[in-house]
UniProtKB/Swiss-Prot annotation:
GO cellular component term of the entry, any: nucleus
Record has Iron as a keyword: no
Name of the gene: atoh8
Organism the protein comes from: Danio rerio (Zebrafish)
Coiled coil: none
Gene Ontology BP annotations: anatomical structure morphogenesis; cell differentiation; heart development; heart looping; nervous system development; positive regulation of transcription by RNA polymerase II; regulation of neural retina development; regulation of skeletal muscle cell differentiation
Protein name: Transcription factor atoh8
Boundaries of every bHLH domain copy: 175-227
Residues covered by region (Disordered): 140-164
PANTHER family referenced in this protein's UniProt entry, alphabetically: BASIC HELIX-LOOP-HELIX PROTEIN NEUROGENIN-RELATED, TRANSCRIPTION FACTOR ATOH8
Gene Ontology MF term list: DNA-binding transcription factor activity; E-box binding; protein dimerization activity
């Protein structure tokens, strides 16, 4: 361990001048390929020669092409499953007709025989989808809007009634709703106009004083009772013969209570 350089592959040589030179081991001789194996290297570089060799039917190249084809199929299936499940760049059947799909599938089969490298087939595999998957997607797309339209249809239309009858029924229902809304608006406006006219006839602190409908009714009742007392008439429900002063006091108390409630709301 003291002199590690003695065991190293490099040898130190002392020259005449005293300088030390390092001598490395000679590299291993380069192995040249024999002429027997040269056609195989040339074959993998040129795909046309590969196709011709496969056509000749030599056993070694046939076995090699079968291995490459099996690897190509396995890699292709994995890539196809991944690409189709992720639903990226899905091809719709409406955009691609059946004739184009068949031509694409035939080209893919031919390319598997011609191309010797599996990497090229892997890159081109995600662009072509099986015909069965495209047909299934076409059926699903055609069935989806049909089911939605059936759910959207009314029960009467599904029962077999013509579209004209359904349209007429809807028009009649809309007319009835419009008439009912008009009657309700007329009733509300009539009641409001009657209370406004009564408010102008009953006594109040000012002509423009705002009173609720309940206050207007109370003041109107007491006002009528007070006028009846002046005419020596008794309009009380229990016939207790209220005096004119009591009727005026009730009107005054109602007006005061209404004024206080309005101030609290403001």
């Amino acid at each position: 361990m003291k002199n590690p350089h003695l065991n190293s592959p490099c040898k130190i040589l002392n020259t005449v001048s005293g300088d030390k030179k390092m001598k490395r081991k000679a590299r291993e001789p380069i192995k040249h390929v024999s002429e027997d194996h040269y056609p195989y290297f040339k074959l993998y570089k040129n795909p046309h020669l590969m196709a011709e060799t496969l056509g000749d039917g030599s056993p070694q190249e046939t076995h090699r092409s079968e291995i490459i084809t099996s690897r190509d199929d396995s890699v292709r299936n994995d890539v196809l499953n991944t690409a189709v499940d992720m639903r990226i760049n899905t091809i719709t059947a409406a955009e691609v007709p059946d004739s184009k799909l068949r031509s694409v599938s035939e080209k893919t089969v031919n390319s598997k025989i011609v191309q010797a490298s599996p990497q090229v087939s892997v890159l081109s595999a995600p662009q072509v989808f099986p015909l069965e998957r495209v047909v299934l997607s076409q059926r699903a797309a055609s069935q989806a809007p049909a089911g939605g339209s059936e759910r959207a249809e009314s029960p009467r239309k599904r029962a077999g009634e013509p579209s004209g009858v359904v349209t007429e029924i809807k028009a009649i229902q809309q007319t009835r709703r419009l008439l009912a809304n008009a009657r309700e608006r007329t009733r509300v406006h009539t009641i409001s106009a009657a209370f406004e006219a009564l408010r102008k006839q009953v006594p109040c602190y000012s002509y423009g004083q705002k009173l609720s409908k309940l206050a207007i009714l109370r003041i109107a009742c007491n006002y009528i009772l007070s006028l009846a007392q002046l005419a020596d008439l008794d309009y009380t429900p229990d016939h207790r013969n209220m005096s004119f002063r009591e009727c005026v006091e009730q009107c005054t108390r109602t007006l005061q209570a209404e004024g206080r409630s309005k101030k609290r709301k403001e």
